[in-house]
Swiss-Prot record:
GO molecular function: ATP binding; ligase activity, forming carbon-nitrogen bonds; zinc ion binding
Signal sequence interval, chain numbering: none
Protein name: 7-cyano-7-deazaguanine synthase
Pfam family name, one: QueC
Keywords from the named record: ATP-binding, Ligase, Metal-binding, Nucleotide-binding, Queuosine biosynthesis, Zinc
Family statement: Belongs to the QueC family.
CDD domains, A to Z: QueC-like
UniProt xrefs under InterPro entries: QueC, Rossmann-like_a/b/a_fold
Catalytic activity as recorded in UniProt: 7-carboxy-7-deazaguanine + NH4(+) + ATP = 7-cyano-7-deazaguanine + ADP + phosphate + H2O + H(+)
UniProt entry tagged with the keyword Metal-binding: yes
Its EC number(s): 6.3.4.20
GO biological process: queuosine biosynthetic process
Length: 226
């Protein structure tokens, strides 16, 4: 039986690392794809490389896509403040990057088709889609339809599947799965700030730290909030 190939979008964060590890557990040959898009938390790319090495991915590519050229997000524009007051239900936060996931998924599908990969692995989850429009199930469902129409493989009936195994999961459940799969949590990076250590106060740090505490591992929390 031929081994299935998957392309995993690998940000360097906990969620994408866990999703990639899940694909590996299913026996996939996994190719990692990361993006240098001008994010202020550039440290996550070092984390992505470390995760790819630890998991033993077949390949790992890092592509430059300068979304900071026009800003529009707290993650790409230093003039926009990183929020620290918690996730507001029903509000799209300033850390949303215009078109980011649309660009990333499109490029991922290109690599997947070039490599003959059956799946594109995405780490989006319930925490993400509560705030970000391009992490929600309805977005992924429609993008899947587009992918099937926009590629040679899709038109021939064997297009790449957008696989988002964490889409209904809480952050705590993701942390627990990461431990089960021996994901190097200490090597991942979630902080939105551009420092060399996690700030402990941005929304991403708060969510990650809360999940780690719920999972019984406060020792892995950021220094500022442990």
């Amino acid at each position: 039986m031929t081994q299935r190939t998957s392309v995993a979008l690998l940000s360097g964060g906990l969620d994408s690392a866990t999703a990639a590890a899940m694909a590996l557990e299913e026996g996939d040959r996994v190719i990692g794809l990361s993006f240098d898009y001008g994010q202020r938390h550039h440290r996550e790319l070092e984390a992505a490389a470390a995760v790819a090495s630890h998991l033993g991915l077949a390949e790992h590519h890092c592509l430059a896509v300068d979304l900071a050229a026009w800003g529009g997000s707290a993650l790409t524009d230093d003039a926009v403040t990183i929020p620290t007051d918690g996730v507001q239900e029903g509000v799209i936060p300033p850390t949303y990057v215009p078109g980011r996931n649309t660009v990333f998924i499109a490029v991922g599908l290109s690599l997947a088709e070039a490599r003959g990969a059956e799946r594109l692995v995405l780490g989006v989850n319930a925490v993400d889609y509560s705030g970000y429009p391009d992490c929600r199930p309805d977005y992924l469902n429609v993008f899947q339809q587009l992918a099937n129409l926009a590629s040679k493989a899709g038109r021939e009936g064997h297009g790449t599947e957008l696989w988002a195994p964490l889409v209904e999961w809480s952050k705590t459940r993701i942390v627990e799965e990461a431990f089960r799969l021996n994901v190097p949590i200490q090597s991942t990076w979630s902080c939105y700030s551009g420092g060399t250590t996690p700030c402990g106060i941005c929304d991403s740090c708060r969510i990650r730290d809360a999940a780690l505490r719920e999972a019984g591992r406060p020792d892995l929390c950021s220094n500022a909030s442990a």
